[in-house]
A protein has these predicted regions:
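Helix-to-loop transition at the C-terminal end of transmembrane segments
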Residues: 24-37, 166, 266
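Conserved beta-strand elements of the Class I
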Residues: 89-93, 126, 154-156
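Proline-aspartate-enriched helix->loop->beta-strand connector
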Residues: 146-155, 159
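Serine-dependent acyl-ester chemistry module
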Residues: 107, 159-301, 319-322, 357-361, ...
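Hydrophobic membrane-insertion alpha-helices, especially the h-region
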Residues: 10-25
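A conserved hydrophobic secondary-structure block that centers on an alpha-helix together
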Residues: 121-147
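Histidine-centered active-site loop/cap adjacent to the catalytic His
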Residues: 8-10, 236, 310, 325-365
Length: 366
């Protein structure tokens, strides 16, 4: 009997040893690849964002693996309160489509836009985008933080589908309390565990459909949008207009960018899973998600005409090009390069038309 007990006791010890070995290996990997101290905590939310009395923003000099933020908490070159004489400072406001982590950090489309602009005058691109930020959050971020750094131009690449979430975007209250720094023993091995994406496609589709059905069943009839919700679209238009007014009120000029997606007008079999994933975070059917995207882009173009704001039609250039998207809306490296080049052309053209009092370069060559 005793030998059997000893044999059973070996299993917990073995499991603990395997997990401990995996954790040690993960920390050594981070040390070698990213120069992260072995005993330091590693948390993307804490390491890259900070809460102050007015907003959530990028953490000054934040770093997470390959990501490095500057003194303003932006992804960009060294920054001072004002741009260098004769230089055009360009700020980018957006959500997760505008930032990249992991090994691809540094290949965000704003970084590639910077490279495309380097031979066309003195430009400084500062990427202030934060994952999950909708228009109200971006407006507060602009008013309370980004505007202080006096950009001349502001690229706005916002996510219309946020307006199809169960709760519509609202202007946030000031953050309460400071985020707590994670303990040094917070596991890093968990982040390396394979996620849902590693499952067979048929299983991923089943999970997505199950989640959608559960969400619909948990609400009254009519909760799921069967057509483009006029009130949500109007809210998007109003919030976008408010951001434009705020940017111009601070002395900068906005550049609006229509939102691109992988889905063409004619759906392909390979699109089914990605549309289910996108739909899962909303209260709309798949076709309505796509229709809302197109309606929001049309609304942005109309706003640009009404306000005299430059609108870059990225959707016309990138939408439907499956090879330029890693999922439903996030770009591959080639997609980011196309986006960066497209925006560089527009930024250079607009910079060449603005008066020199806006701290613009006299060497700009559209």
């Amino acid at each position: 009997m005793l030998p059997r007990v000893r044999a059973w006791l070996q299993w917990p010890v073995l499991i603990v040893a395997i997990l401990a070995g995996g954790e040690i290996a993960a920390r050594l990997d981070d040390l070698v690849r990213y120069d992260v101290p072995f005993l330091a905590p590693l948390d993307v939310g804490y390491d890259l964002t900070v809460r102050d009395s007015t907003t959530i923003r990028g953490r000054p000099f934040g770093r997470f693996k390959k990501v490095r933020l500057n003194a303003a908490g932006f992804r960009g070159p060294t920054v001072t309160p004002a741009a260098r004489a004769g230089c055009v400072r360009v700020a980018v406001l957006g959500a997760s489509e505008s930032v990249v982590g992991g090994e691809a950090a540094g290949t965000e489309y704003p970084a590639l836009m910077q490279r495309a602009l380097d031979g066309r005058g003195c430009f400084e691109v500062q990427n202030a985008a934060l994952s999950g930020f909708d228009l109200p959050h971006l407006t507060v971020l602009w008013n309370q933080w980004v505007a202080r750094w006096s950009p001349a131009l502001v690229v706005v690449y916002t996510t219309p589908a946020f307006y199809l979430r169960p709760d519509a975007p609202t202007y946030p209250d000031p953050p309460t309390g400071r985020a707590r720094k994670p303990k040094w023993w917070t596991p890093r091995l968990e982040d390396r565990a394979p996620g849902e994406w590693s499952l067979p496609e048929v299983v991923q589709k089943w999970i997505a459909r199950r989640d959608i059905e559960r969400a619909v069943a948990a609400h009254d009839a009519g909760w799921e949008y069967q057509e483009v919700p006029a009130d949500r679209l109007a809210r998007y238009q109003g919030d976008l207009d408010s951001l434009v007014v705020a940017i111009r009120g601070a002395g900068a000029e906005p550049i609006l960018v229509t939102h691109a997606m992988r889905f063409a007008d004619a759906m392909r079999p390979s699109d089914e899973l990605e549309l289910l994933k996108w739909q899962r975070g909303t209260r709309a059917t798949g076709p309505v998600v796509l229709a809302f995207e197109r309606a929001a882009n049309a609304a942005m173009l109309a706003l640009g005409r009404r306000r005299g704001v430059m609108v870059v039609d990225a959707a016309a250039r990138l939408t439907g090009r499956q090879e330029w998207f890693v999922d439903y809306i996030h770009f591959t490296v080639p997609g980011r390069a196309v986006m960066g080049a497209l925006l560089a052309d527009s930024v250079a053209a607009l910079a060449g038309r603005l008066p020199p009092t806006r701290a613009l370069s006299d060497r700009v060559t559209p």
